[in-house]
């Protein structure tokens, strides 16, 4: 137990040092920050990170064995991520701040609400000048309860693949300690990622179908670790060395 606490303390210390160092690099180089092609000519050159906590409200997403819904975990990690990015001087927006669907009122069926929710999220992202989208999700594969680890997926916009690879490079040593993963292009079936003009990365933080990983994903300390790794990866990408 003592060894576990020491390892966890070292991890948090390492992440904190990375955040401070990368924050300094980012702030020093913000005047020459990279501007994605799709965002040029939209006003300020400063990027805004749109954080998207997947699902919400009646659409709980994947469900852990104990009944915990993905949407609540997504929101908790997203709020931690927002705090870290703001601390580093990054502009942020969230598609939702509560456990609710982002759909139009008065819709009768769940299908109508889900379609509206995705359309509204895409419209929100496309309305933010010079945006970068980070969509936070949890995975599930009930047919293989031992499957675990975090993985990133990128859309077709310029810079997205590099960002996904940078985030994955941080997630592998931090949380994928037994099995490294490679980032992948997002499937065409994922509506939001394929209907935004911004570079977008979807982060599957873990598998709720894996009992041990589901328990970790519900722990605040683990959520903070994930948020810190994602924030540090974004800042590293923005610093310029991993954009191509």
Predicted regions and their residues:
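Catalytic-site microenvironment of enzymes
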Residues: 1-244
């Amino acid at each position: 137990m003592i060894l576990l606490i020491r390892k966890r303390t070292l991890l948090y210390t390492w992440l904190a040092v990375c955040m401070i160092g990368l924050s300094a690099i980012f702030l020093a180089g913000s005047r020459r920050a990279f501007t994605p092609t799709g965002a040029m000519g939209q006003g300020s050159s400063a990027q805004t990170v749109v954080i998207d906590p997947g699902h919400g409200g009646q659409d709980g997403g994947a469900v852990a064995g104990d009944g915990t819904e993905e949407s609540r975990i997504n929101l908790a990690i997203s709020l931690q991520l927002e705090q870290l990015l703001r601390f580093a001087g990054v502009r942020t927006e969230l598609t939702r701040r509560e456990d609710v669907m982002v759909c139009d009122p008065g819709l009768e069926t769940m299908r109508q609400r889900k379609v509206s929710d995705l359309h509204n999220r895409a419209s929100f992202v496309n309305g933010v000048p010079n945006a970068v989208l980070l969509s936070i999700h949890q995975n599930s594969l009930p047919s293989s309860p031992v499957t675990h680890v975090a993985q990133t997926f990128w859309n077709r916009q310029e810079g997205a693949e590099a960002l996904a690879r940078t985030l994955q490079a941080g997630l592998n040593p931090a949380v994928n300690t037994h099995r490294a993963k490679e980032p992948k292009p997002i499937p065409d079936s994922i509506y939001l990622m394929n209907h935004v003009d911004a570079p977008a990365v979807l982060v599957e933080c873990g598998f709720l179908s894996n009992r041990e990983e589901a328990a970790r994903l519900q722990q605040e300390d683990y959520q903070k670790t994930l948020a810190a790794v994602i924030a540090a990866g974004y800042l590293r990408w923005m610093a310029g060395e991993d954009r191509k």
